[in-house]
Amino acid sequence: MLKNSTQPAGGGNVMYPGKVPGKVKYTFAFGALGKDMIYGMIATFSMIYFTDIIKVAPAFIGIMFFAAKIWDAFNDLFMGMLVDNTRSRFGKFVPWLAVGTLINAFVFIILFTDFHLSGIGLCVFAAVAYILWGMTYTIMDIPYWSIVPNLTSDPHEREKVSVLPRIFASIGQSLIIAGFGVQIIKGLGGGYTGYHRFALIIAATFIFTIAVTVINLPKKQVGKKAEKVSFKDIFSIIKRNDQLRWAVALILLYNVGIQFIMGVATYYFAYVCNNSGMLSAFMISASIAEVVGLIIFPKVTKMLSRKKAFLLACILPAIGLMILLLTGIFAPQNIVLTVIAGVIVKTGTGLELGCATVFLADVVDYGEYKLGVRNEGVVFSLQTLIVKLTAAFTSLSIGFALDLTGYVPNQIQSLATQNSIRVLMCVIPAVGMLLAYVVYHRKYKLNDAYMKKVVSAISSPQTELTSEKTTEEAA
């Protein structure tokens, strides 16, 4: 069972108490490029590869994806526990990061290899390969993001450190894979050959970028030996860390909006705007805008505050989605207004990505301040759990909504179906994102001033970490 402790914290539990050297910052962030290229390939192309290239039944793939995401979401918590319990001369992050990358790259190549199977054998192969890929990706993804709160305790430096890997991740996943993946696959031969060659290139890039990260991470071990965490303790951590619960809640609400936008966009442009070609313009411009949002995040927080940065992150997408909704009704073929809407939406989501990473890093420090334990692995595993759970349930919700309104593939849709697509694409995401700010405003208390007190308290080896009662009274 977890107990309050008096172990040295803060300064002893971060690699750099102040400014992080540029080499460390950028080589750490560089790893996210390959990491999210491999994730983007699975997220964007695995379904069409399974159904159109190796001919797995679409109904089976839909069920498989849903089951795999649910399993993988809870597997993340287990991985977070393993990371927090790891003790080695290389620390608790690097071993999992290195081993997970190599295994995941190998499984990724196998997944995009055609073994000329059919029937039950093909279904078994697809299920095993896809689930194994998700599990092995978790092995390296959880420790990667768990490094963030351990690089520095300086608030402004943490904002910079948090945003850099998100920028590289957006370039890898949204711009390279989602934006130009189709053209690259065609250029590499198209069909199975194009997919397999592209997978080999991505796997090699993945290994190289993570190797650069691992080699340049400081070898200094942080913190003292801490009490081991059991699976039961995970729920105790969530129960006792109130700010972790509210951070999870607001990130969940926001992510519901993102998942609906990404899941419905293809249908929106094909059947509401009647122009599938507009999807590429929307996605490429939006991807660039997301990177811009991430780049300006540290400056926005410095000029305004984190609270106002998150307010912008919630309001901008709502404005952009309303522009997109009105454009779809009155000028569905207007590509300029569509691009403008996409840029506004994704500038906001770029700011949110920066905010979310900083929120979770602050929650780690707050957990140490309040409970005497950091639990980076558990905290950051909850982020990936949220993404996977919302992806699973959003996909299911979209399918049910389209079915209930009479959606017919490759046909002109009824007005009821078009309106349901509009609601799924524009209204539900906007509501989810605005609700996220309501939760933040009313329940999340780790603002700039409060975090200065937290960091000051945990940075002193002589400071005894407060009990829950003392912390709540101080708040």
Where are these regions (language model features)?
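Membrane-embedded alpha-helical bundles of multi-pass transporters/translocases
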Residues: 2, 8-468, 472-475
